[in-house]
Amino acid sequence: MNTASHDTVRALEWRDEGLYLLDQRLLPDQEQYLCCADAASVAQAITDMVVRGAPAIGVAAGYGAALAGAAAWRTHGSGWQAGMAEDIDTLRRSRPTAVNLGWALRRMEAFAARLPEDQDPAPALLAEAQAIHEEDVAANRRMGRSGAGLIQPGSGVLTHCNTGSLATGGLGTALGVIRTAWADGRVERVFADETRPWLQGSRLTAWELAADGIPVDLLADGAAAALMRTGQVQWAIVGADRIAANGDVANKIGTYAVALAARQHGVRLMVVAPTSTIDLATPAGEQIPIETRDAREVLYAGGRRIAPESEAVGAWNPVFDVTPAELVDVIVTERGVVHQPDADGIARLFEGAG
């Protein structure tokens, strides 16, 4: 497997003046792309989890902002900068926890503010969105190489949720590390939690790894601790939707349980995320907004209700949880690696950054 030219899966691509998103709700049964021709449809696709994963959401938001600017020029002419504000706000509200979303929109807004108001901004905005996409592809490769170098040959690894090409613009974050380590002969066995209730592990991660010819064993989320106790796993490798300034990590629900089990059983925990996922404005995990989704996602599976039909039966459905920094052994970013992360280590990643 050549990770340098990896292009097995594309979660999103720009063509024919629109953003095409691989509809991840339909995988692995159907590979169908949804075309988004305006910012509102991009925002709805993010909310509905057509596209998911913090880096991919950020890339999609960049393209959504480009569509917003193009539409504002057509409608308002020289007033396009003010005209795109409503669409930007709609995009910003689409998913509250993934910080890459806000990061990409702030970057696009700042770029738009530097453009002349009396010229069509569409080509320049599209080029900036494509730059965000290309930078994510490059960051994935750097993180994959850095993270793989920490893994000893013959290791077993466990991952949670989906952090591959479906969740990013390129190779993946945590799954990018696993792909690279597999290609290097460092990983002997890959385990993936099924990741209820959306089953991103069994539907998406297993699908990606199978496409690459990498064997993977799925397990129920509740089996992770028992697996670690057997000694078959040396690393738990996960992504992140937001990392606070002190190193606390918000990620897919169940990550905290994986981290606790890993610490109990001597398994090291690696978090892999681009620096756009780090929110220096959020001091600690307690301040990270945690999205809660519809109870039906827990009460139903495959379109069929699996819980009793009773008003007495409800569901609690937070999408993310927060893992304290003290449970994290290493955070891998495109700018460097932070061992035993804390506020000082996180801050050093941004030293000299423009």
Curated annotation (Swiss-Prot):
Substrate binds at residues 52-54, 95, 200, 251-252. It is an enzyme of class 5 (isomerase). The active site is at residue 241. Keywords: Amino-acid biosynthesis, Isomerase, Methionine biosynthesis. Its EC number is 5.3.1.23. It catalyses: 5-(methylsulfanyl)-alpha-D-ribose 1-phosphate = 5-(methylsulfanyl)-D-ribulose 1-phosphate. It holds the Pfam family IF-2B. GO terms for molecular function: S-methyl-5-thioribose-1-phosphate isomerase activity. SUPFAM superfamilies: NagB/RpiA/CoA transferase-like. The keyword Isomerase applies. Catalyzes the interconversion of methylthioribose-1-phosphate (MTR-1-P) into methylthioribulose-1-phosphate (MTRu-1-P). This is Methylthioribose-1-phosphate isomerase. It comes from Halorhodospira halophila (strain DSM 244 / SL1).
